[in-house]
Amino acid sequence: MKESQLILNIRKYLATIPGCFYWKEHGGQYGTAGIPDIIVCHKGKFIALEAKVGRNQPTRLQAATIELIRRAGGVAAVVRSVDEVKEIMQTI
């Protein structure tokens, strides 16, 4: 599976959660480097999800951003499946 397909599957899942606001962060020239793929707000909690497949790992900048989000009180994670996202969302 490609990361783009995983992101699509995660977005489809998030769309089923009442009151869940989310958006796909777009990289490239007009995006902000290091920002996780999907940003979520649910029940007042900030959640950042970086999708990776296979053995792919976050870049140093992505890992640093995830750590900054956690230090600020948000939830941030590298996710490899919709099931992992479900586990995170069930803790909110």
Give residue spans per PLM region.
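Catalytic phosphate/metal-binding cores of nucleic-acid and nucleotide-processing enzymes, i.e., regions
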Residues: M1-I92
